[in-house]
Amino acid sequence: AMVYKAQLSISNLDRGWYGQPVLTIARHPSETEKRLMLRVLAWCVRAGEHLEFGRGLSSDGEPALWETDDTGAIIEWVELGAPDVRTVRKAAGKSEHVLVLAYDEARTKPWWKSVKGELSKIDKLTVIFIPDSEADALAAMALRSMKFAVTIQDSVIWVNSDTADVQINPEYLKRETQRWT
């Protein structure tokens, strides 16, 4: 695995969460920089005191990110891509909140069409799609050592570095009922 470091300054006005975490991210040999950067983006969107990266692509049954409380109970379960219904149901059964961060329009549109009916029944689930051009622009910002300012307001995400700025307008395919996203 290749190791990346990300120094972040996060201002999430939607959630009232502010922090300056330093993340160490292991990139699996088969993982693209786009997916790596989307994991960082997911971390920023769901930032929390105990949020951490899962063991990676080769670890079945473990999310891309998760947050546990002091008792070990799972608060937040984050999946990337287009997980099957069984995986999402399992996540919902084990955690308080589930986020699916979908990307790759060619894959996401048919996936969502096929799972929408089943996944719409899961109250604690949020599904966000990141448009291809914005995911590609974010991937282009990947460096082994990164420094970003991330601002989230009105569900829009701005990622700024010394060399580039990306505005991400996530498309909410499904919002969790009775919770901010």
Residue ranges and their predicted role:
Residues A6-L8, L65, V156-S161:
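Short polybasic amphipathic segments
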Residues V22-T24, I75-G81, V166-L173:
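Short amphipathic beta-strand/extended segments with alternating polar/hydrophobic composition
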Residues K124-T181:
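Non-catalytic C-terminal interaction segments of nucleic acid-processing enzymes
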